[in-house]
Amino acid sequence: MAFSVLAAVLTQTKVRMAQMLETGKSFKITHFAVSADGHDPLDPTTARTPDPSETDCGSVIFTKAFVPGDVTYTSPTCPTWACNLAAGDVTGSVSQICLIGTVEYCPNPLDTECVLPATEFVVAIGTMPLKVITIHDTVTFNVSIQF
């Protein structure tokens, strides 16, 4: 199964991107997290709208690192990450995918965000109606962000 998800870039990410232009501190999207926090609890067929001020992914049930080849470009300003779940990775309810960034470079060697383990943060959140995944399902969530 494959699903397309358009994720909202969070305010904290926009702040980091603005600071990157000044300081050179950089990050990249390194992994994703899955939760069941993306649907309307009163109507699971409806995705909730992500709040750009959110800073975490809620009740995470699974995380996985991206590997080379997991990102493609729908257009020059629209990267898409393939969030691949193998059979047995997740069972149960899924309605939210979070793209997680890791600080990769700090021009100031005393910056604590670059001390290992490097700082990680939620870059973007994609929500969808509730999906139920069984132990035998192989699922790909194609998560895009737009600039």
Question: Whereabouts are the PLM-identified features?
Answer:
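Small cysteine-rich, disulfide-bonded extracellular modules of the LU/uPAR three-finger superfamily
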Residues: M1-S95, T102-F147
